Structure formats: C-alpha cells, structure tokens
C-alpha cells in the first residue's frame, strides 16, 4: 500500500472515531486516496470482525475502477478481497471483505435485509454528487442504524459538500478533514463564442491548448452528442494525438482505454461528460478544458415528464473539474467563460432529489414501510408535489393501493430498473410477449441506435436489433445495438425466454409502451403530427415522421418542451386493446343544448375518448346525482315555483323567526339550491328532460319535508287562510322576513269586525289591505278600530259616489258584512 496519499494523515483519526462512535463525515478533495486507500486501512478494526465493508459509488464505471485499484494494491483481481456489484454484473467471492456497489444495488440490499447483518461499515463515497439513490440509501441506513443496528457504522465521504451541515443532520457526527494534495493550477479564461456550438467552442480551445501546453488533455462537455461532434471536428484536423470519448453508454473496454496511458506513449485527449469529475483517475492529465456546461435530467412537475437540460456548471463543479489538472503536478485549466463571471456562477449543484421524478423512491419507501417520507431523516427532504405525482403514477401502475405497496408493486421491485420499465416487463410476461418486451425495455434504457433523423417509430429500432441478431445488414449503430442486446439478454434471463428473431405485430410495441406510460397514450388532435395525450398534454412528431399517418400512438420518450412536447420515441397503438381489457365506465351527464340526461358507456384512455355506446339501463342514483348538480348550477328556476309553494316557504320562514324553538326545514332558496340532495332526490327518479322539472309540485314536495306535528303547528300559528265576518276564507300573504302577513279583503266583508285580526296565538296582527268592490286598494292599516273611527267616514263618501249600487252604512261596527253586491238603502 502506498504511503504518499494525503489521506494517510487522517486515517488514525477515522479509525478512532469509527471505533468509539457509529457515524463520521470525511471531507477530502479528489486524489486524496479516500476511495482507494482508506477502505483497506479500516479492514482490521474490531467491529469488522466477521463483517464486511460496503462502499457506495455513484457510477458503474467508478465502481469497477475503484474495485480494480483496491485489488491491485493487494496484488489481486476483483472478486477476492475486494469485489463489486453493479446492475447485471457481479464480481464477489466468498472471501470478499470490501464490496463496491452502485446506488440501486445498495437500496435493493437494504430491502432484502433491513439490518444489513453481514456488513459492519457502509461508506458513501462522492456524497457531494447528491444523487437520488445516495440520499435515499443514507436515510434508510440511518433508520436501520437507529432501530436495528446501533453497531452499524456509517462513513460519509465528500469532496466539496458542507460537512458541518451534514453533521448537524446526522446527529452532530464528527467531521474529519483531509487537506488533500493539489498542485498549483493556472487558469486561462476564454470567451465563449455564442455564434458557435458547445462542440465548436470546446474543440477550438482544445486546439489552442495543444499549441500552448504540454501533456494530456481532459475536456468536459455536457453530453455524448457534444462529445461525438467535438471528436469529429478534432479528427478532421489530423492531429498526431489519440482522441478518446468517455461517457456512461460506451463499452467497458472503450472506457478503460480512456483511463489508461496510451500504449505507445502518445499524447491523448479525453472528451468526457461529468463522469470524470471525481472518483476516476485518468493517467497523465495536465490540462483541463471546461466547456462550462453540464447536462442533467430535470423533472417538470407541470408536465409530469423528465427531460435533459443543458445548464451552466456550478462553482463547486467547475472547481472539481479544474482539480483534475493538478493531481500529478502543476496544471492548466482553460475555462470557456470570462473570469469576471466566474463568481456569479451558482455556488453548489442542486441535490437530485429536488429535481428528479420520484416514483422509484416512493415505491422503495412503500416497500420499506414508510410511504410518508417525513418519517425518515433526510439531508434534503423530497418535495411534496413530486411525491404526490409519483404516488399517482404508482397507483396507475397498480403498484400502490390505499397507501400500501401491492403484490404488483413488490414484483416491480424485483427488476433493477424504473417502475415504468418494470411494469412493461411484467405486462410482457403476463401476455406471453416477454421476448419483445425485453427488447423494448432495452431500447428504452439505452441510447437510440438510429438517431432522431430516422423518425420516432420504435419498430424501426426493433427491426434493426432483429437484423443485427440475424447478422443482416443494418444502418443502426452496432455498438449501441450490442449494448441493447446485452440489456435485453439480462431481461430475457430474468423472464426465462429466448431472443426474438422474427417480426411481430406492428402494434405490439405500442401495447407495451402503453403499459409503461398509460398517461402517454395519444390521439391525433386535428392536425397531422399533433397529438393529445391521455393526461391532456400535447406533443408533436417531427415533419415527415413515418408515424404521421397514425391516429393513435403510445409515446415512450419525449421532451417536455415549453408548450408542446417533442416526440422522440413512440409506436402505433390500437385503442381497442383497452376495450378488450377493460369494462369501460358508465357516464351520465346533462346535455345542456338538448336539455336532457345522456347516459352512455365509455371507454377512455385518461382524457381521451376511444368509443361510447348508449347505456340502456342507467343507474338511477347516478342520474339523481347529476340532476342535483344541475339544480346547484341552474337554480330554483328549473322548477315551477308557483305562488302556493312560495307562500309555504314564507309561512315556514316566518314561523321559524317567531318560534325558533320549533324545528322546521330551511326552505330559503339559497339553501334549497345548495343542498338539493336533502329535499329533491326522492322526486327526481323520473326526471329525464328539462320539462320534467316543471311537472314537479313544489308545494307537495316542500310540505312532505315538514313532520306532521310541525305541520299542525304551522297550520295553527301561520294558517294559509283566515275567516272574515262575511264567512269567506281569505288567503294570507306571508313575508319571508317574518313581518306582518297581508290580508287583502274587500272592505264590505269586514263590516262588524272591530279589531285587526291576528295569528300566531294572537301575537301577530295582520296588515289589512282593504279593497273596494272592484278589488282596488282603499286603505292599508294595521289598526282597524282606528280606521273605522277616523278614516272610514271620509272613505264612505268617496265609495258612495263610485259604487252607488252598494250599501255603505254609517255604522260599520253593527253593519252586516257583505260578500257580493247589496243594494244600497237610500239612507246608507
């Protein structure tokens, strides 16, 4: 073991803290030896007797490379003292003491054994990258440590993260700092030409660095497309320099060639994504060219889609990239931005948990037993909006039900992939199309072998893969097809099926995509190439795409875009599949134009109508629910609210005011409209058209709401009519505010009545509207006695002139009341 690594200075402190406590944070810059030296120096600690070290690396390439370095120091190969586990690949033996794993592997191990009984120390390497799985795994490990394994040690290692902040969240865990080893770096700032692409700008600065400096060059570009374009530009110059690409999708042997010195000792250029920022050691690098950009996945809450976004690097990322130039000796870093703008860069990268799609995290939490994420201790808590959207997706995939993981959800976790892809594979297994499902899943997980210019149809990729398997000619990228076949083979092994080498139904891929992305089933939306998805969003195919003539498609890959997404990968879809597999849904609604109930059976994909048929025997309860909603919207004017019903409302309202102790229904219009279920439901069973509302007798309906004892009180205290001296029963006109009801009666019919009539047990006098024989108003009074005495004599004079055939006695108190016309006595 080499003793010139800076990490050696703090190894005693790390050993001491891990012996006395169970959690420690180590801050050490890249190149200090924390990944490749420290684990070996901890193996003899007493708490690791009979236990292993589990070290988490964020990337597969880094996991392999770290394991090889550990093995080399012991004169071994991976699988002996040190081993690794990555997706679809494992090099671990019975004597392995240090296991280097990628993040998804650790999560799976925790789910299989919550207490991690075989392990004494968990190391989180490169934690500053703040990947989603690292945050989740740390939260789960912390809970396992607190509840099941207080003896389990956790070591969090970071190059740039704020150790004090992590310490506080991890229970004030000790922070140990290694100064590292960094040679001086000269910074050269070069203006970015906005008229050129990132690849053009980067290649220009690389050529400048070749002329100005000696040594190998590491250039950072955002994505694999930028790398390929930059490589094409450099290769056209015919440089006597080896040019290597380095990104995650490349074959392992190509990646290793980029890490090692050139066999013939030639100078080399490595064009890399952010994969080379930390754990990987690339021999001979003295010059770094930083494009200033990185490409990161971002989840759009509003669209529900994840898209890759090219963003400016943060200060901590720029510093890490520059640090690669100063590991072996003094170096140079070319930055493609002005020096004055460097301090304006965002200080730190955002944790992935804040911007990622969280369905896999939520499924893991549900399987752990904590769908409520707040019950775990997080370095950065996941956003509630993203959690809600993930829960909704998992419910659509039948992975969650009523907040619990389902049998289907547990089956999804058996596949080391996103829940959508796992659901696709399960669908293929259930429908006996596992081989094609394996191919579709592999194509979705790997890079596109044809490129976007070939169009969006995934069947073209399936054909290319089939041709490649049959050793037939294909224009597709053979390296990508090889990787795709490797992944497909892993899925076929797990599903126990053979490879697909023959053509399949054109819509089969669409069925599989629809299973994984049910909300992205899409129907052409009036304009060729424009599709409306089941979730209501809109996406477009590129002009001249082979799928343009398809009415229905299922979309696997698209960019969220600003208003309309761009479709990158899709397949034709037969919507009758949904009719065959689903029972459809009964829909009952009110047709405003025709004023009638419409009942149909519909088959839908989300918001998209596939087909519908008339429903012969609709559910009456559902009809009543729709009608009640119509009443809420349209109001009481739907009904024939005649005077008799109106007066009942006013009588009840008045009595409620006069006697609040009497329990009576609330018949105010606002209350009736707000809660039609309470009074209208029993009478709506036969209503189908707007005219049917007018046929309902509101007086009878309202009367039925009043219990018999209260009805008796209503008739007694607030009668509908009262008798007058003539023997007539005269209706009262009640007011909803409880004021005096009006008794509109001809004057002659109350001759002989000395005082104003009353109701409500004599407590409420009526308001008399005294009328002429022609029912014209003569006088309004609430004091009949005063009227007879003071006003009647004058009124009599006028009435005798106007109504000469009628009798108008001088003494109204003793006069006989008259119903009809009575001949006037000459003296009267």
Where are these regions (language model features)?
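Second RecA-like catalytic domain
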Residues: 233, 239-240, 245, 257, ...
């Amino acid at each position: 073991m080499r003793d010139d690594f800076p990490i050696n200075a703090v190894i005693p402190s790390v050993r001491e803290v891990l012996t006395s406590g169970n959690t420690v944070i180590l801050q050490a810059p890249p190149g200090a030896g924390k990944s490749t030296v420290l684990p070996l120096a901890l193996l003899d600690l007493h708490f690791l007797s009979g236990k292993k070290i589990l070290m988490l690396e964020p990337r597969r390439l880094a996991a392999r490379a770290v394991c090889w370095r550990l093995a080399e120091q012991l004169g071994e190969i991976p699988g002996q003292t040190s081993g690794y586990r990555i997706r679809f690949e494992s090099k671990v033996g019975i004597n392995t003491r240090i296991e280097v794993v990628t993040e998804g592997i650790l999560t799976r191990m925790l789910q299989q054994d919550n207490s991690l009984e075989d392990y004494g120390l968990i190391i989180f390497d490169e934690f500053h990258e703040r990947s989603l799985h690292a945050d989740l795994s740390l939260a789960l490990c912390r809970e396992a440590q607190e509840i099941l394994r207080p003896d389990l040690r956790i070591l969090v290692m970071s190059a740039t993260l704020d150790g004090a902040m992590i310490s506080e969240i991890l229970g004030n865990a000790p922070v140990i700092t290694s100064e590292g080893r960094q040679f001086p770096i000269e910074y050269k700032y070069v203006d970015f030409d906005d008229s050129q692409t990132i690849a053009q700008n980067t290649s220009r600065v690389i050529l400048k660095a070749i002329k100005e400096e000696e040594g190998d060059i590491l250039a950072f570009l955002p994505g694999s497309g930028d790398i390929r374009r930059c490589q094409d530009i450099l290769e056209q110059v015919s440089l006597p320099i080896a040019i290597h690409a380095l990104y995650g999708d490349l074959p392992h042997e190509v990646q290793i060639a980029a890490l090692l010195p050139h066999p013939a000792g030639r100078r080399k250029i490595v064009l890399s994504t952010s994969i080379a920022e930390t754990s990987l050691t690339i021999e001979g690098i003295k010059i770094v060219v930083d494009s200033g950009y990185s490409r990161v996945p971002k989840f759009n809450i509003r669209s529900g889609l994840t898209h890759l976004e090219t963003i400016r690097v943060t200060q901590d990322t720029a510093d890490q990239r520059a640090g690669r130039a100063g590991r072996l000796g003094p170096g140079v870093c070319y930055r493609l931005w002005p020096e004055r703008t460097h301090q304006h860069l965002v200080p730190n990268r955002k944790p992935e948990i804040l911007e990622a799609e969280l369905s896999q995290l939520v499924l893991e939490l549900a399987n752990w037993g904590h769908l409520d994420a707040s019950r775990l201790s997080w370095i950065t808590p996941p956003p509630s909006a993203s959690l809600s959207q993930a829960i909704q997706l998992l419910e659509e995939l039948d992975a969650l039900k009523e907040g619990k993981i389902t049998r289907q959800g547990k089956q999804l976790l058996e596949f080391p992939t996103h829940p959508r892809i796992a659901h696709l594979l399960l669908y293929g297994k259930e429908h006996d199309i596992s081989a094609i499902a394996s191919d579709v899943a592999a194509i979705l997980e790997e890079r596109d072998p044809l490129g976007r210019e070939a169009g969006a149809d995934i069947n073209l990729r399936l054909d290319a893969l089939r041709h490649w398997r049959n050793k037939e000619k294909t224009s597709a990228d053979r390296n990508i097809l090889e990787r795709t076949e490797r992944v497909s083979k892993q899925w076929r092994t797990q599903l126990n099926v053979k490879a697909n080498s023959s053509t399949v139904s054109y819509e089969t891929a669409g069925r599989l995509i629809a299973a994984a992305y049910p909300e992205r089933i899409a129907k052409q939306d009036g304009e060729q190439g424009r599709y409306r998805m089941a979730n209501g969003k809109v996406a477009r195919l590129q002009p001249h795409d082979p799928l343009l003539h398809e009415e229905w498609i299922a979309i696997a890959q698209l960019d969220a875009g600003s208003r309309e997404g761009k479709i990158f990968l899709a397949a034709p879809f037969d919507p009758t599949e949904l009719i065959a597999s689903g029972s459809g849904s009964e829909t009952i609604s009110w047709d405003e134009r025709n004023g009638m109930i419409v009942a149909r059976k519909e088959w839908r994909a989300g918001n998209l109508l596939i087909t519908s048929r008339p429903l012969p025997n609709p559910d009456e309860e559902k009809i009543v629910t729709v009608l009640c909603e119509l009443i809420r919207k349209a109001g009481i004017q739907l009904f024939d609210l005649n005077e008799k019903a109106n007066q009942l409302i006013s009588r009840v309202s008045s009595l409620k005011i006069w006697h609040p102790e009497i329990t009576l229904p609330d018949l105010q219009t606002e209350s009736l409209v707000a809660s039609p279920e309470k009074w209208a439901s029993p009478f709506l069973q036969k209503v189908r058209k707007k005219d049917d509302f007018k046929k309902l007798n509101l007086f009878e309906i309202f009367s039925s709401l009043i219990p018999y004892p209260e009805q008796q009180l209503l008739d007694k205290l607030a009668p509908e009519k009262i008798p007058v001296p003539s023997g007539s029963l005269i209706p009262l006109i009640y007011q909803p505010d409880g004021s005096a009801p009006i008794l509109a009666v001809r004057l002659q019919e109350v001759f002989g009545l000395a005082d104003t009539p009353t109701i409500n047990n004599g407590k409420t006098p009526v308001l008399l509207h005294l009328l002429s024989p022609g029912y014209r108003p003569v006088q309004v009074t609430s004091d009949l006695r005063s009227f007879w005495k003071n006003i009647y004599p004058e009124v009599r004079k006028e009435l005798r002139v106007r109504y000469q055939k009628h009798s108008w006695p001088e003494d109204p108190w003793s006069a006989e009341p008259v119903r009809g016309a009575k001949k006037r006595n000459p003296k009267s």
